[in-house]
Regions:
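Conserved alpha/beta enzyme-core scaffold
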Residues: 1-397
Length: 397
């Protein structure tokens, strides 16, 4: 697409997209006059362009992205989608990425499909008939993979705290991608009747299904089924998803709707962030003023878990206590220009390798105390002094 656009000197094409895997040549500075990337969630392949101003992003809750198309805020001319080959009845599958695709496609003038035999066939809202496709191009290449990395000692400890203290038998779980969620999942081998209702899931879920730990039998909605909206993982995950009726891939405005999330029994939402301040404000999408990622589904699930119908929801923010350079991720105040994704009123638990900070019902003095206790020991004294300067009182339980 990029090569064709440059060769034909096509100008001012706006590309709206979710997180993308692989190279993004359209986002290179030399192609800025041809294409402008507008991301709903910034990936590493467009991050530099967004920060340089040659690309852009839309801050938005993941569950509200379909509204952008359904209500005409963005009117696509063409939807480029990725599907499996059609079955004997003419139905293709969106496979690993249902999220907001149907909303965008239904509002587009034309639908162009890349048909790939390596795309797993999934069910639910993933099914689309070939009669809806205006153009189809066969291109059979393996999907991008994210192989599981061994968690660090600190990530393993975070996973242990969460698995042993915050995840109960019968819990319904949401987790993102990364070493911390993988660490949590790897330590749930003795749990029973876990359920999955998550915008995404990865390889760790496959292992728990095979061990009999994830059954979804205590769920009250979609009982006996994993519910997701998109997936990124290894080939093992894609093979597990293919033709598997145990999995329902549904639209993200349903999966991530906080009202739907709140109905899940023992909803346990595990999300990460960039930094937290001593009052519990969570920054997840920027480093200071520089945009880094996006809202994603964090607040959708944190809110849903906090407002759970059964009163047993657990909204969890998990992070290592320091950066790779040793800078504390628990700060007296967020960096200048940093955005708040999850506000301090809805945060319940903050977990680092040093423990669990329980924040619900705590005043500012108590919150500062809880968070400083899970900060890295090298930074606690400085944080206490900064807390006193900010709150005019020493942190105390």
């Amino acid at each position: 697409m990029t090569d064709y656009g440059v060769r034909c000197d096509v100008r001012n094409v706006r590309l709206y997209h979710m997180h993308l895997e692989g190279p993004a040549p359209f986002a290179k500075p030399e192609n800025a006059k041809h294409f402008r990337s507008i991301s709903f969630f910034i990936g590493g392949n467009v991050r530099q362009a967004v920060q340089a101003g040659t690309a852009d992003c839309i801050p938005i809750f993941l569950h509200e992205i379909p509204r952008v198309f359904n209500e005409g805020h963005v009117k696509p001319d063409i939807s480029l989608i990725h599907v499996s080959p059609p079955d004997e009845h003419g139905f293709c599958s969106l496979g690993t990425s249902v999220d907001c695709v149907r909303s965008a496609a239904s509002q587009s003038k034309y639908i162009v499909a890349l048909v790939n035999k390596h795309m797993p066939r999934t069910f639910g809202d993933a099914i689309i008939h070939v009669s809806h496709l205006d153009f189809a191009v066969e291109h059979h290449v393996p999907l991008p993979v994210h192989d599981v990395k061994k968690p660090s000692k600190e990530e393993q400890q975070i996973g242990k705290y969460i698995a042993e203290n915050l995840v109960t038998d019968g819990a319904t779980m949401q987790m993102g991608i990364g070493s911390i969620p993988d660490a949590v999942l790897s330590l749930l081998g003795n749990h029973k009747d876990l359920g999955i209702h998550s915008e995404m899931f990865s390889d760790g879920v496959v292992d728990l299904v095979h061990k009999g730990c994830v059954t979804n039998n205590r769920k009250t909605m979609h009982k006996g089924r994993i519910v997701g909206s998109f997936c990124v993982g290894s080939q093992k995950l894609y093979d597990f998803m293919h033709n598997n009726p145990f999995i329902e891939m549904l639209m993200v405005d349903y999966v991530n709707n906080p009202k739907i999330v709140a109905k899940q029994p023992n909803m346990t939402a595990i999300n990460s962030c960039i930094e937290v301040d001593i009052t519990g404000q969570v920054c997840s999408d920027s480093i200071g003023p520089k945009m880094y990622s996006g809202f994603g589904g964090q607040l959708d699930f944190i809110t849903g878990a906090a407002l759970s119908d059964d009163g047993c929801g657990k909204p969890i923010i998990a992070l290592q206590s320091v950066t790779s350079k040793g800078v504390s991720k628990i700060q007296p105040a967020l960096k200048t220009g940093a955005g708040v994704v999850t506000n301090r009123a809805v945060v319940r638990y903050v977990v680092t390798e040093h423990g669990i900070a329980s924040l619900f019902g705590k005043n500012l003095q108590q919150r500062a105390y809880e968070l400083i206790q899970v900060a890295h020991p090298d930074h606690r004294e400085t944080l206490e002094k900064s807390a006193f300067e900010r709150l005019h009182v020493m942190p105390a339980p």
